Amino acid sequence: MAGSELEGMKMEQSRERFANEVDVALAQPASPFAIRNARKVDARGVAEHYWLVSDGDAIVAVGDRDADFAAACASVGLDADTDSDSVSSADSGNAMTGSAGSVTDAAGRMMTPGYVDIHAHGSWGSSFDDGVQGIRLARAGHMMHGTTRQVLSLITNPLDVMCANLQTVHGMMSARPDILGAHLEGPFLALSRKGAHDPECLKDPVPEYVDRLLQAAGGCLRQITIAPELPHGICLLYTSPSPRDA
């Protein structure tokens, strides 16, 4: 086996391991956790020796005073003085660190708000149009790099394929709080501005096509890229996001 093939296999195995860790984490019930000794970076600036405490569902307290950290931990049933999970400086970032019901020492690592992405088509060689497995791997790739929530962008395809892809996104949302919904980039694009989209699949947004997509989405459609200059483009701008009654 060539060296490049071996490296590719190792990469795929590493990605699958991380995706499995994400699956396990999402399947577990929410539990309190805390992170301490982090370098916090957000819109307010940079702060050293920062900590965060969550009850499992929401952040309940943040700060940089040790006494306040102990009190915040106690409020969610954690002991700030127990041995904590550690994030070593040599950690490659390819594994999820810490655990539910734990106190994690960030060892000076950076802590930022989770990113929310509203336009990306995939990651790690997988597309959000590639079904449940494709979404699973692509979301793991984004999650590893800090995107905690995401609107999944779907490209122009035959209408029945786009409807099926919307149904897949809708079906995953109940078990995947990290999936915020779907973004349709197409099929209602101008031929002159189509980019890499298949021109054979581009359509004018007549009510029939719009209703089919809305029905398939089941309420998961968050945004759609359209060309308002199309014959029915302006009409689409005034369309309710809920499908019309049959």
Residue ranges and their predicted role:
Residues H121, R136-N165, D178-L191, A217-P231:
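Divalent metal-dependent hydrolysis catalytic cores, especially in the metallo-beta-lactamase
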Residues A190-Q215:
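Conserved phosphate-binding/catalytic loop of the ribokinase/pfkB sugar-kinase fold
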Residues G3-S75, S84:
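N-terminal metal-binding scaffold of metallo-dependent hydrolase/deaminase domains
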Residues Y238-A246:
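Single conserved hydrophobic/aromatic residue that forms the stacking wall/gate
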Residues R139, L166-H170, V210, L237:
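Generic structural signal for well-ordered alpha-helices
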Residues V76-D79, A107, N165-R176:
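Short amphipathic alpha-helices and their capping/turn segments at secondary-structure boundaries
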Residues P205, G218, P231-L237:
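Acidic, metal/ion-coordinating pockets
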